[in-house]
Curated annotation (Swiss-Prot):
GO cellular component: ribonucleoprotein complex; ribosome
Name of the featured protein: Large ribosomal subunit protein bL36
Coiled-coil regions, chain positions: none
Biological process, per Gene Ontology: translation
Similarity annotation: Belongs to the bacterial ribosomal protein bL36 family.
Any GO MF annotation of the entry: structural constituent of ribosome
Organism: Rhizorhabdus wittichii (strain DSM 6014 / CCUG 31198 / JCM 15750 / NBRC 105917 / EY 4224 / RW1)
Keywords recorded for this protein, A-Z: Ribonucleoprotein, Ribosomal protein
């Protein structure tokens, strides 16, 4: 999982990326290609 300040560019790298908020943190997850995981931090 990558930790980035801005998730907007990571969201646009794959069409299945989703931006999810869990426990006050923002994540990018991808069900079909799991290497596109990232957390905002």
């Amino acid at each position: 999982m990558k930790i980035r300040n801005s998730l907007k560019s990571l969201k646009d790298r794959h069409r299945d990326n989703r931006v999810i908020r869990r426990r006050g943190r923002t994540y990018v997850i991808n069900k079909t290609n799991r290497r596109f995981k990232a957390r905002q931090g």
